[in-house]
Every structure is written in C-alpha cells, then in structure tokens.
Amino acid sequence: MALKNFNPITPSLRELVQVDKTNLWKGRPLKTLTKGMSKTGGRNQQGRITSWHRGGGHKKLYRVIDFKRKKIDISAIVERIEYDPNRTAFIALIKYDDGEYSYILAPQKLSIGDRVISSQAADIKIGNCLPLKSIPIGTTLHNVEMKIGKGGQIARSAGTSVELVGKDSGYAQIKLRSGEFRLVPLDCKATIGSISNPDQKNINLGKAGRNRWLGWRPHVRGVAMNPVDHPHGGGEGKTSGGRHPVTPWGFSTKGKKTRKNKRTSKFIVKKRK
C-alpha cells in the first residue's frame, strides 16, 4: 500500500497523509462475522472516567477475528482483503474448503486467491500458521501465542513482526520490534510473515476533527487546569507547574516503569531498548 497526499484546497488537506486503500474491499463486512459495539465514552460500570480523552467517534461493527487459527489441516482461499476500523492492520476474509468463512489478520504480500492453512507441518509460506517448533530459525512471524491455545497476542498491529532467533529446553526465543528478547513455549502457534499496512506510522490526520471521528477527545494540559483537578493546576498567570511532571493522581510520569507482572518476568531474556 502507498500513501496518498492531497492538493491543499483547504487547510485541513494541506498536511493530510492517508494510506491508499483503493485495492481493499469496498463493500460491507460479512454479516455472520460481525457484532455490534456499544460505546463507553471512557467510563466504567460506575460511570466514572477510567480512560481519559475518549468519547464520540463513528459507529463501528466489530469484526470477529480468528486469532487462534483453530481449523487444523483444512486449506482456505483468500476471498478479499478488507479495512477494519477496530485495528490498524488490514484483515483477510478466507473461505475454507468445507465452506466456512473466517477473518484473519492480513500479512504483507498476501493476495486474493492465495491459499493458507493452519497445520502442524505446513509449508513456510506467507499466511500459514504453525507451532514454533515446526518453524525454522530466522523466520519472520506475527500473531504469536504466549500461552498454548489462547490465540495470538504478540505482533498484531500494522507493520509489526517478530523474528524467531532460537530454540532451547522447550522454549522458542523471539526478538520483538522493541528490542526485547522473550521466551515462548515451542507448542505455541505463530503465523508466517509481517502484518499488513506498514505505512500506518507515516499518516497525518490533518485536522482535529479526524481524531474526533476516531473517538479521541482533546487532551487538556495539567497546567491549564485548576488545583482541584491536577497537581500542576493553578498559579497566577501562566506557570510551568512548579514540580517534576506527574499524573493527575500525583505519580511520576515521563518514563516511569509501570510493569507489575513479576510472575512472567522470567520469560524476558533481554529487556527492550
């Protein structure tokens, strides 16, 4: 996919850069593989804001994605590549030889008419899903499981991938884009190739309204608030906050580590850069 630039006939078009979606399916998604979504506006069940700056946005249908690739040893053909408003990657509608349809994450270079399969010993080909023990070292992967049978969790967003760098003592060692090296059980599945839409990182929304369409509300600075609302609030005239940057709840920000799950830290061989 390429990037689209626009003639600056309006101010919002001057900086706008979008991903070219001319080769994607232009119709509606398959109805049997969609679900309705209700908006939360960033509120929890008590009505309190738990995710700031969320709200509004265009209506969406959730596309049910098969992250587990649970139909084993049944070949499928790629019917079409589609846009999915719920993720940055594109998705592929595949039709199995037994007639069932499914959505999967579309890797780069996957085309309409290609055949894919999930198997214990499939060919090392774009879109095929195999256990890590059956994949040669040096292969580029996406949608990698962390727990056997749970479904892919690693490398699912646009343009991402991991590299298989080693196997030892029942675990595969993978290198993530962040520079982290992590151990994953050899029986976990992964799909061959990199995720589609690598140009997502180069887009420019061009105007605030386009962010509102995506469900994002304005980000208000703490120094622009009152003291009751934020530790940086208040002061006579414009101030710089007067302290090291903190969250609205007083915790240090700007690089403070937030990872709590020590239980799985033993699987991280080398921390990210």
From Swiss-Prot:
It comes from the Bacteria. Keywords: Ribonucleoprotein, Ribosomal protein, RNA-binding, rRNA-binding. GO terms for cellular component: large ribosomal subunit. GO terms for molecular function: rRNA binding; structural constituent of ribosome; transferase activity. Residues 254-273 have a biased composition (Basic residues). InterPro entries: NA-bd_OB-fold (IPR012340), Rib_uL2_dom2 (IPR014722), Ribosomal_uL2 (IPR002171), Ribosomal_uL2_bac/org-type (IPR005880), Ribosomal_uL2_C (IPR022669), Ribosomal_uL2_CS (IPR022671), Ribosomal_uL2_dom3 (IPR014726), Ribosomal_uL2_RNA-bd_dom (IPR022666). One of its GO terms (biological process) is translation. Residues 228-273 are annotated as: Disordered. Part of the 50S ribosomal subunit. Forms a bridge to the 30S subunit in the 70S ribosome. One of the primary rRNA binding proteins. Required for association of the 30S and 50S subunits to form the 70S ribosome, for tRNA binding and peptide bond formation. It has been suggested to have peptidyltransferase activity; this is somewhat controversial. Makes several contacts with the 16S rRNA in the 70S ribosome. Belongs to the universal ribosomal protein uL2 family. This is Large ribosomal subunit protein uL2. It comes from Rickettsia prowazekii (strain Madrid E).
